[in-house]
Amino acid sequence: MSKPIVTLATCADFPNLDEDDRGLPQALSERGIEPRIAVWNDPGVDWSNAGVVVMRSVRDYARKRNYANFLRWARSLERPLNHAEIVDWFGDKHYLKDLAARGVPIIPTTWLEPSANLSKHQVHTRFPAHGDFVIKPAISSGGRG
């Protein structure tokens, strides 16, 4: 009888997984599962043979023009643990608006949409003159973006 397969999807920046995930393959093996690691956009990977696919260190999805390709790939998976609809919702930080509308506390957030085409001065005037703040693209991952 063959072992169940779990493929940990990552990106080319972390072909052997992120440091926090490096213990996963051994933990899966110890539980009788065949672990695999694959870069999500590697054309040489046969995803139809990947078993359950768990998206882990797929951080490069946020790079320009990668997001649509990433979602296309996520939708093509036969057995994803992270379903494409959730990945799409969670991949764009506007999901925080949905959470706030349902009463979940979020950090104070000012949304600056790219279509507003604001100058640096206009962006600066949207924030209080005191305190720290973070400017981050809506589609970003980790501390990147």
Predicted features, each with a name:
Residues 10-11, 56-57, 82-84:
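Short glycine-centered, acidic/aromatic-flanked micro-motifs in structured strand/loop junctions
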Residues 2-10, 71-77, 85-145:
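Active-site nucleotide/adenylate-binding loops and adjacent lid/helix of ATP-dependent enzymes
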Residues 2-31:
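Short, charged N-terminal beta->alpha structural module
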Residues 34-38, 81, 110:
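General small-molecule cofactor/ligand-binding pocket signal
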Residues 47-74, 78-79:
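Short, structured active-site "lid" loops
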Residues 16, 62-63, 143:
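Glycine/Thr-rich phosphate-binding loops of Rossmann-like dinucleotide-binding domains
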Residues 29-45:
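A short, well-structured beta->alpha microelement
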Residues 18-22, 68, 93-97:
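Short, surface-exposed alpha-helical segments at coil->helix boundaries
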